[in-house]
A protein has these predicted regions:
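Histidine-centered catalytic micro-motifs
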Residues: 9, 33, 43-55, 79-81
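Conserved, mostly hydrophobic/aromatic
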Residues: 31, 38, 49, 107, ...
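Structured C-terminal cap/extension of enzyme domains
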Residues: 178, 217-221, 241-310
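N-terminal small/glycine-rich loop or linker at the start of catalytic domains
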Residues: 1-23, 124-132, 138
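Alpha-helix-loop-beta-strand connector modules within alpha/beta enzyme cores
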Residues: 9, 57-82, 155-159, 215-225, ...
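Glycine-rich, proline-tolerant flexible connector loops at the mouths of alpha/beta enzymes
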Residues: 19, 44-66, 198-203, 261-265
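Active-site mouth loops of central-metabolism enzymes
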Residues: 11-32, 84-91, 141-146, 168, ...
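Catalytic alpha/beta core domains of metabolic enzymes, predominantly
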Residues: 106-258
Length: 310
């Protein structure tokens, strides 16, 4: 019998800017509402960033996370996954601050340094509400997103060791899987672990179904299919097709306005819940079931919602 599909929703992220969609959650209240609605629609994990409530700029301050994490916890049983990616240009200490302050069940962790180019968005968006938006996009033409072996080890030991937090290991290219393997071999990553395969970011692996097949096959060879859970996210218009392919292949998936602002060609998603509802319908029409938060916790061996710091 096929495993149920774990749906992660990433409601705001740190890539899109407020001028790109009026539906992008910005304030703590908006992020809380978007997360609760996504959980009610079928997401079992919520991947969370924070933003400055007035400007919408990615903001790592723990006090912002503390304004929405408890609200989400009070309203749902969803697993909360705090980003350590933060916003482009943040130091590793800044990126870890929210997670080390809140001790979540899960945190994301990028598994390799890379070019992270979102500057092509400037070809589409030319008018901005806030002064920071255009320079933020422009700087990524000459920017390397740093995730060294030393900083990855630090994050694993700090969050995993000190807090019992487990990771969503974000792999933007084939080599990132081998980086995960190195840490597995060192005994720093233990099964069951969670691999998020990311497609369609300029600087990472392209959104081609052949690459999805190769990434999945390589992960099986490196880790053994019984030792890990895998999930797929794809940027922009590739979001739903790649999520569907992952479900068909026995994997899990991620949607949300962090990864795509749209629900269809040229049509902005009105909410994160709209995307979750769409992919849940697809999954169920394929004869598959959607995982509950309890099922996600069991399969990922999480510490439980009663062990967090919020």
């Amino acid at each position: 019998m096929p495993k149920s599909v774990i749906i992660t929703c990433a409601p705001t992220g740190g890539i899109h800017t407020p001028s790109m969609s009026p539906h992008l959650p910005i304030t703590p209240a908006e992020i809380a509402t978007a997360s609760i609605e996504a959980a009610q629609a079928g997401a079992s994990i919520i991947h969370l960033h924070a933003r400055h409530p007035e400007t919408g700029k990615p903001d790592p301050r723990p006090e912002l996370f503390q304004q929405f994490l408890p609200v989400i916890k009070q309203s749902t049983d969803v697993v909360m996954n705090v980003s350590t990616g933060g916003g482009l240009g943040m130091s590793m200490d800044e990126r870890l601050l929210a997670a080390t302050s809140t001790s979540p069940e899960m945190a994301s962790l990028n598994m390799g340094s890379m070019n992270f180019g979102i500057f092509p968005m400037l070809q589409k968006y030319t008018e901005f509400q806030h002064d920071w938006e255009q320079p933020f996009l422009e700087m990524t033409e000459d920017f390397i997103f740093p995730n060294t072996f030393k900083t990855i080890r630090y994050a694993i030991e700090k969050l995993g060791g000190d807090h019992g937090t487990k990771f969503e290991f974000e792999c933007y290219d084939l080599g990132h899987l081998y980086n995960v393997k190195w840490f597995v071999d060192q005994g720093l990553i233990k099964p069951p672990f969670f691999i998020q395969m990311v497609f369609g970011i300029l600087g990472g692996v392209g959104a081609d179904s052949d690459h999805l097949t190769h990434m999945h096959n390589t992960a099986d060879k490196l880790f053994g299919a019984e030792n890990y859970e895998w999930s797929v996210l794809a940027a922009g218009r590739h979001q739903m097709p790649f999520a569907t392919q992952s479900a068909l292949r026995g994997g899990n998936l991620r949607v949300g306005l962090e990864d795509s602002l749209f629900i269809g060609k040229g049509e902005l998603a009105q909410s994160n819940a709209e995307q979750v509802t769409r992919i849940r319908s697809i999954v169920e029409n394929l004869g598959l079931t959607v995982a509950t938060p309890a099922e996600a916790r069991m399969r990922l061996a999480l510490k439980g919602g009663d062990q967090v710091g919020f």
